[in-house]
Amino acid sequence: MSSWKSQRRIWDISQTLRPGLPIWPGDTEFGFERTWRMDEGSPVNVGRMTMSTHSGTHGDAPLHYAEDGLDAASMELDSYIGECLVVDARGVSGEIDVADLPHIESADRVLFRQWDSFPHDEWRSDWLPIAAETVEWLALQGVKLIGTDAPSVDPQESKTMSAHKAVLKHDMRILEGLVLDDVPEGRYELLALPLKIVDGDAGLCRAILRELPDAG
């Protein structure tokens, strides 16, 4: 048998789904149980999961923030595949504003890192939201997907969802809950396909970054 390994480095930027996974306050906790067991005579092991559509790393569907928006089964896929720019926003305070981004170059997809270390074991509400004006500016630059290692592009207590609404206005897409701890600022290939869920307001992703072909 031949052994194949990609010559380009891969970063897994997904959260691990597990009991105890931090969740949005009041949302459905992640649960997993084995329903068929080989140690009980079944020829196979089979499990059952319960979770929110916004558990872990996920892509919001427009249905999440617009009553007539596309569901997760209807979203096009090209936004979630291709070259992206990872931006280190750890020095920013308050919210990610246009003034914080003078170094952003042209890119179809922009991912923001704000945590020094991703909070795998606790829910933190002190993340950096993305200003609606920043979304508007990114859209003018041709950006079609915004990603963040935060649980949301808006503040936890937001009632206006202004960043989400700006994304909707420009038919952009959102990835939330990324894990970017080990990823240096720069350009990568993104692959992060949300699950195809009818009536889904979001789809869980196994998101990865890969070195661009000419890197190194």
UniProtKB/Swiss-Prot annotation:
Substrate binds at residue 24. Pfam families: Cyclase. Pathway: Amino-acid degradation; L-tryptophan degradation via kynurenine pathway; L-kynurenine from L-tryptophan: step 2/2. Zn(2+) 2 binds at residues 60, 164, 176. Homodimer. One of its GO terms (molecular function) is formamidase activity. Its cofactor is Zn(2+). The lineage of its organism: Bacteria, Pseudomonadati, Pseudomonadota, Alphaproteobacteria, Sphingomonadales. It catalyses: N-formyl-L-kynurenine + H2O = L-kynurenine + formate + H(+). It comes from the Bacteria. Zn(2+) 1 binds at residues 54, 58, 60, 176. Its EC number is 3.5.1.9. Binds 2 zinc ions per subunit. GO terms for biological process: anthranilate metabolic process; L-tryptophan catabolic process to kynurenine. This is Kynurenine formamidase. Keywords: Hydrolase, Metal-binding, Tryptophan catabolism, Zinc. The gene is kynB. The active site is at 64 (proton donor/acceptor). Belongs to the Cyclase 1 superfamily. KynB family. Catalyzes the hydrolysis of N-formyl-L-kynurenine to L-kynurenine, the second step in the kynurenine pathway of tryptophan degradation.
